[in-house]
Regions:
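Substrate-binding pocket helix/loop in short-chain dehydrogenase/reductase
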Residues: 129-130, 134-142, 232
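Alpha-helical segment proximal to the catalytic Tyr-Lys
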Residues: 158, 201-205, 260
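Conserved glycine-rich cofactor-binding loop
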Residues: 47-48, 71
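Non-catalytic terminal and boundary segments that flank Rossmann-like NAD(P)-dependent oxidoreductase
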Residues: 1-38
Length: 278
C-alpha cells in the first residue's frame, strides 16, 4: 500500500470515529392514533371552534390538553365538553404580567407536571378597514394576535429549555398573511408568520420545533357558520370552507414526531386562498 493510500485510510477512519456520536437512529413512524401519546398540550385561547377541534384531535391522538381562554365560563364549559383528558385555566392575553404565574398553574394541572406542546390559537379580527381604524381596535387585535403569542411562546419555550423538553410549538396564522396587509388582522398574522421563522431558528438548537398552520376560511362562528350550514363558497378555488376538524387533524401531525424535520414552516390549509388566489 502506498503512502497516499495509507493516509487516506487513516483520514477516513478518523472521521468515521469522530462522527459516531452524531449517528441518529431511524425510528419507524408511530400509529397515528397514538402520535401524541403521553404528551400534555397547552392550547392558548382554545375555547373557539378551531381551538376545540384541535383539542379533540389531540385527545384522539393520545394527548392530554389544557385549555386557556379569557372567559372562565367558556373555559369551564369547554372542559366539560371535552372530558377527563382536559383541564382549563383562565388567561387574559392582554395581561402579559400574569403569564409566568398562569403557565406555572397550567403545568400543575396534570400529574405529569409538564407541557410538551404549545398551540397559540388566539385570533381576533377587528371590523375596521384601513382609513377608519381606531387605535383601540388596532391595539386589541395586535395584543391578542401577536403580542400575547410572542410572550406566551417566550415563557413556555424558556420552561422547555430549562426542563430539557424537546417540545413542539404551533402557531395559528392565517392565509390572510399572504395578502397585501392593510388591516390590523392581516398585519398581525403576517407578524406571526415572521415570528414563527425567527423562533424556529432560535429554538431548534434545544430540540424545540416551531411551525405554523395558516387556515383560510373555516366553517366557524367567527365567519357566521354553524352546524348544518353548507360548506360551499365561491370565494376560494376549492369552492368550500375548511372544517375545524381538518385543522385539528393537521395540527396533530404538525406537533408530532412526524414533523420533527419541518422547521419554521407555515402549512396553508386554505383551499388555495392566499397561495394561488389573493
Amino acid at each position: 500500500m502506498g503512502v497516499g493510500s495509507k493516509i487516506r485510510e487513516l483520514i477516513d477512519y478518523y472521521y468515521s470515529k469522530k462522527n459516531e456520536k452524531n449517528i441518529v437512529p431511524i425510528n419507524i413512524p408511530k400509529n397515528q392514533s397514538n402520535l401524541l401519546k403521553n404528551k400534555v398540550a397547552l392550547i392558548v385561547d382554545g375555547t373557539g371552534g378551531i381551538g376545540v377541534a384541535i383539542s379533540e384531535s389531540f385527545m384522539e391522538a393520545g394527548a392530554k390538553v389544557i385549555i386557556s381562554g379569557t372567559s372562565e365560563e367558556k373555559v369551564t364549559k369547554t372542559v366539560e365538553k371535552l372530558g377527563n383528558a382536559a383541564r382549563g385555566i383562565q388567561i387574559d392575553l392582554n395581561n402579559v404580567t400574569e403569564f409566568n404565574n398562569k403557565v406555572s398553574q397550567a403545568i400543575s394541572l396534570f400529574p405529569e407536571n409538564r407541557i410538551d406542546i404549545l398551540v397559540n390559537c388566539a385570533g381576533v379580527h377587528g371590523d375596521q378597514k384601513f382609513g377608519i381604524v381606531s387605535e383601540a381596535t388596532y391595539d386589541a387585535v395586535m395584543n391578542t394576535n401577536l403580542k400575547g403569542l410572542f410572550f406566551m411562546t417566550q415563557i413556555v419555550s424558556n420552561y422547555m429549555k430549562e426542563k430539557k423538553i424537546k417540545g413542539h410549538i404551533l402557531n395559528v396564522s392565517s392565509a390572510a398573511a399572504l395578502k397585501p396587509g392593510y388591516t390590523p388582522y392581516e398585519i398581525s398574522k403576517s407578524g406571526v408568520r415572521s415570528f414563527t421563522l425567527g423562533a424556529a431558528a432560535e429554538l431548534i438548537p434545544y430540540g424545540i420545533v416551531v411551525n405554523a398552520i395558516a387556515p383560510g376560511p373555516v366553517a366557524t362562528a367567527m365567519l357566521g357558520r354553524k352546524e348544518g350550514d353548507t360548506l360551499y363558497t365561491d370565494c376560494i378555488p376549492a369552492k368550500r370552507f375548511a372544517t375545524p376538524s381538518e385543522i385539528g387533524q393537521l395540527a396533530v401531525i404538525m406537533v408530532s414526531d412526524m414533523c420533527d424535520l419541518v422547521i419554521g414552516d407555515t402549512f396553508y390549509i386554505s383551499g388555495g386562498s392566499g397561495t394561488i388566489q389573493y
